[in-house]
């Protein structure tokens, strides 16, 4: 039995003595490892605008804890006695990535689970795939009966709730509702209220103070943010133009910098990052994705839904489709080529040509208002307020 499971035994015992308290909300993200995504932005919104609510971020990393303490943001280390008491009293458990964002948040009377999804539906999500498909994708062996029982026990001790316990999830437009529904059972509500993390894209003063790449002020910034391969079990995305000194020289001469940011799920497969004067790998810099896209003049991706967030900035988008993700990986719910939100390329030469075209005629390649409104019902930076209202007055947001 590992450490978390042992602590889980203690947490289960402690929970007997604490009832849920109204207006006590806890937040977590990224399996307890980082402070970002929707939980970050909704928590800070709550602290500023609704101080009558008792809110606290739960983390499993001491670096995150120290960072938040310095910022004056309520935070506790997940495995401490103080955090276990905080969690035991929480009315709302709010998370962004997995149920493992916060340990020991067991089901109990009066408790609510709110999942701030970390992306809009495009590629097929785990919840829409069979366990057998996921096992094959990841190259895993079939679990034995004994292992399955151990996993169930671990879930009971450390997590204590399931996907069906989620009260609702949100989408950014009505177009996306039917695809989000493919990922959740009918008892999970779907509300078109936006994403809390996108409010930051409307907050220029805030973004000036967020951590960002040093030494690139005044550069024309192109950020490449591909999605994961096989949910972290696939081959890492190669850095474009790593073996093209001609392209690197052109970028340098024209004041262009290409930032390479692999998907967080692939982080364990990123061993040797490649950086040059005009190409910088930022994968391991622990940068907030919203900060990355805010400071980018052009976003390059493939099947990550980050481009939907980026539409709010009304800047050019390039889809660099370099492999057979659609047929040999998880695939997608719909074909974005049928109503393209940006430009498409399939090899480095075409990618380079698009960079030159956009640099020379930037405004020509901005997304249309029609495309923006297809993926965003609201373009106002008020998603956190809508989320607050959806949680506190749910009948008004069915």
Task: Label each residue range with its predicted role.
Residues 1-84, 397:
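N-terminal pre-catalytic "stem/leader" segment of glycosyltransferase-like enzymes
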Residues 1-3, 12, 19, 23, ...:
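C-terminal amphipathic helix plus adjacent low-complexity
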Residues 2-9, 121-132, 137-232, 264, ...:
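A nucleotide-sugar donor-handling region in carbohydrate enzymes
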Residues 36-44, 182-183, 190-273, 345-347, ...:
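Conserved catalytic-core segment of nucleotide-activated headgroup transferases in glycan assembly
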Residues 40, 69-135:
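Extended catalytic core of nucleotide-activated donor transferases of GT-like folds
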Residues 75-92, 259, 264-308:
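Donor nucleotide-activated moiety binding/catalytic core segment of transferases
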Residues 93-117, 121, 287-330:
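A donor-sugar binding/catalytic signature common to diverse glycosyltransferases
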Residues 135-146, 271-276, 305-375:
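Catalytic binding pocket for nucleotide-activated donors in carbohydrate/polymer assembly enzymes
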């Amino acid at each position: 039995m590992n450490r978390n499971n042992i602590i889980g035994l203690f947490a289960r015992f402690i929970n007997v003595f604490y009832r849920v308290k109204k207006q006590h909300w806890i937040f977590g993200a990224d399996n307890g490892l980082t402070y970002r995504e929707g939980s970050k932005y909704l928590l800070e919104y709550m602290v500023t605008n609704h101080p009558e609510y008792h809110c606290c971020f739960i983390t499993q990393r001491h670096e995150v804890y120290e960072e938040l303490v310095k910022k004056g943001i309520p935070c506790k280390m997940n495995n401490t006695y103080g955090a276990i008491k905080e969690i035991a009293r929480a009315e709302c458990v709010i998370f962004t990535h997995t149920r493992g964002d916060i340990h020991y948040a067991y089901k109990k009377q009066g408790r609510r689970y709110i999942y701030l999804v970390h992306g809009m539906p495009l590629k097929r999500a785990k919840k829409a795939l069979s366990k057998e498909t996921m096992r094959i994708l990841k190259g895993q062996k079939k679990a034995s009966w004994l292992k399955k029982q151990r996993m169930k026990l671990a879930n009971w001790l450390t997590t204590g709730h399931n996907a069906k316990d989620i009260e609702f999830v949100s989408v950014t437009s009505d177009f996306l509702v039917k695809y989000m529904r493919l990922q959740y059972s009918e008892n999970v509500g779907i509300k078109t209220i936006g994403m809390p993390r996108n409010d930051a894209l409307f907050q220029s003063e805030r973004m000036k103070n967020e951590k960002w790449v040093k030494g690139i002020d005044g550069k024309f910034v192109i950020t490449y943010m591909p999605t994961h391969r096989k949910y972290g079990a696939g081959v890492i995305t190669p850095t474009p133009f790593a073996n093209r000194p001609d392209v690197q020289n052109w970028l340098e001469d024209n004041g262009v910098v290409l930032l390479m940011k692999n998907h967080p799920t692939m982080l364990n497969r990123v061993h040797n990052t490649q950086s040059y004067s005009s190409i910088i790998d930022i994968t391991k810099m622990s940068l907030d994705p919203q900060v990355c896209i805010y400071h980018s003049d052009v976003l390059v991706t493939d099947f990550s839904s980050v481009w939907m967030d980026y539409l709010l900035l009304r800047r050019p988008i390039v889809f660099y489709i370099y492999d057979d993700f659609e047929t040999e990986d998880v695939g997608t719910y719909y074909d974005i080529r049928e109503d393209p939100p940006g430009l498409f390329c399939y090899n480095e030469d075409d990618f380079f040509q698009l960079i030159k075209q956009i640099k020379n005629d930037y405004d020509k390649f901005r997304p249309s208002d029609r495309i923006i409104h297809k993926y965003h019902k609201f373009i106002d930076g008020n998603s956190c307020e809508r989320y607050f209202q959806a949680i506190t007055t749910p009948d008004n947001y069915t």
